[in-house]
Regions:
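Phosphate-binding site of ATP-dependent enzymes
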Residues: 5-7, 44-106, 119-126, 147, ...
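Peripheral (often C-terminal) accessory segments that flank ATP-dependent C-N-forming ligase machineries
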Residues: 182-278
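Acidic/histidine-enriched active-site and ligand-binding environments that engage anionic O-linkages
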Residues: 12-21, 92
Length: 278
């Protein structure tokens, strides 16, 4: 990574080539920043775009660091997500791993998973646990990871010191995240011995089914997702049959329509650019 927090945005020297990914280090502070073209994450093709973006950010109320990262190739299905819980003694006790299938395409939602299929990868779990235990971390953590198609390595992008907004993928696979926190810190109950690795099969999704299946290019992965739908192992946290409020029952439909509209337009634009580049 490179970071820019100096007076001259053009003075940034990058250890990697363009294109690059740029984003604020503090999403909380960035929430209050207001400037034309604001996005959650920026995908920048050249130095001119980087300078313009940094200048726009510096003109806003945002005073934190702005991170610039190497662009790792691969679509959303190359992303991985890992949720962990470390007990009050700093020992990792629970992990749940998944493969992202589709991410939000709205400017302020980029990077938020819309669909995750449960997976297991004990190598990644071991690497994350080694880091967490080395620093004495406690509580929930959420890792963003990407598989680099150039060498098959796993690139750890960041660790969020909390549950991720899509943590329902853990629940969908059969594990209650609240149980770990309650038993460890509130009820004082002993946790299961050793490390518990989630192994349930599920498809977490808040994306329209047609959009999700259309986005996935890999035939084997698409068949797997179709199979999970057929088995009824898909779970949408916005779909709550017991909800009595008409407004809340309608919201998932509105959300799905907005996602369908945004994703359809973004996917059409991307495929047009790919065709033009051939």
């Amino acid at each position: 990574d490179a970071s820019a927090d100096g007076d001259d945005p053009a003075a940034v020297i990058l250890p990697f080539p363009f294109p690059v990914v740029a984003k604020p280090a503090s999403s909380a502070a960035y929430h209050y920043a207001d400037f034309p073209g604001k996005q959650k994450v920026f995908f920048l093709r050249d130095a001119a775009e980087l300078r313009a973006t940094l200048a726009a950010v510096q003109s806003s109320r945002y005073e934190g660091k702005f991170l610039i990262q190497e662009m790792i190739p691969g679509d959303d299905t190359s992303m991985r997500i890992l949720t962990t819980y470390s007990d009050q003694n700093g020992k990792v006790r629970f992990t749940s791993f998944g493969q992202t299938l589709l991410e939000d395409m709205r400017p302020m939602g980029v990077g938020n998973p819309l669909a995750i299929v449960s997976r297991t990868d004990e190598t990644i779990v071991a690497e994350a646990a080694r880091l967490l235990e080395a620093v004495g971390y406690t509580g929930f953590a959420n890792f963003d990871i990407k598989v680099d198609p150039r060498d098959g390595s796993h690139r750890f992008f960041e660790i969020n010191t909390r549950l991720g907004r899509s943590n329902y993928y853990v629940t969908a696979a059969g594990d209650n995240v609240a149980r770990w926190l309650m038993d460890d810190l509130v009820l004082g109950r002993p946790l299961p011995e050793g490390l518990t690795i989630a192994r349930g099969e599920s498809l977490y999704t808040v994306a329209p089914k047609a959009i999700l299946l259309d986005y996935i290019r890999d035939d084997a992965l698409r068949r797997e997702v179709r199979g999970l739908y057929a088995l009824g192992r898909d779970a949408d946290p916005l779909d709550y049959p017991a909800e009595k409020s008409l407004r809340r029952r309608l919201y998932p439909l509105v959300f799905a329509f907005r996602q369908w509209k945004t994703c359809r337009a973004a996917m059409a634009d991307k495929r047009a650019r790919e065709k033009a580049a051939e």
